[in-house]
C-alpha cells in the first residue's frame, strides 16, 4: 500500500473527537485516596505493559531524582501484567513514598487536577487520547517522542524527550526545579471542528 500513490492520495488520518465538557465535569470529583501533602506531582495514566509503555524508564528516572534529593510524587493510574514487577522495582529502589499505585480508575480525571505534569515514557503509541485529556485540563505534558508528539506537544503543551532514562530524568528534574506549563491554550472546539470537516470531506469525496 505504501507504493500505491492513488491509495495514499485517497487516505486521511482522522483523530478522535473529544468530549471536553464531560472531562471537565468529571474532573471536579473529589479525590480521597491520596495526595494530602503538597509536592510536585507527575501523573501517568495507562496500561502497565512494558513492551510499549516502558514504565521501567519512569521508575529508573525517579530513582535518579531521589538520589538528587528532590521532592516529587508520581501517581500511576492503571494496571496490567507488569504491575507486580513494577511494585517490586519500586520497593527495591525504596521509592514507596514517591511512586503511588492507584490502580484502574473509572474516572481518572480528578487525578489530572492533582498533577503538575502528565508523563508518558512509551516506546510507541497510537494517538494518545491522554494528550488531549491533559491539554483540556491545562496539564502540561512530558512525553517521549512517539506518534505525533513533536507536532502536538513541543513548545506548546509541554516537552518531548528522547526514549531513554537520562532524557526523561532531565525533563522531570527541570520541571521540578523550574516548573512546567502549557504555552498555548488548547481550543478543543476548534479541534473537534477540524475533525468534523475532515470527516465531511471524506464522505463527500
For the regions a protein language model found, what residue spans apply to each?
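Acidic anion/phosphate-binding donor-loop and adjacent secondary structure
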Residues: 2-3, 15-34
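A conserved mid-protein helix/loop that constitutes part of the nucleotide-sugar donor-binding site
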Residues: 40, 49-64, 74, 81-87
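Nucleotide-activated donor-binding/catalytic signature segment of Leloir-type glycosyltransferases, i.e.
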Residues: 87-103
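Aromatic "clamp/platform" in nucleotide-sugar-dependent glycosyltransferases that forms part
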Residues: 104, 123
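Short glycine/serine-rich donor-binding loops of glycosyltransferases
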Residues: 128-131, 149
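Short hydrophobic beta-strand element within catalytic cores of glycosyltransferases
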Residues: 140-143
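Conserved acidic donor-binding segment of nucleotide-sugar-dependent glycosyltransferases
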Residues: 155-166, 174-179
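A charged, aromatic-enriched C-terminal amphipathic alpha-helix characteristic of glycosyltransferases
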Residues: 179-205
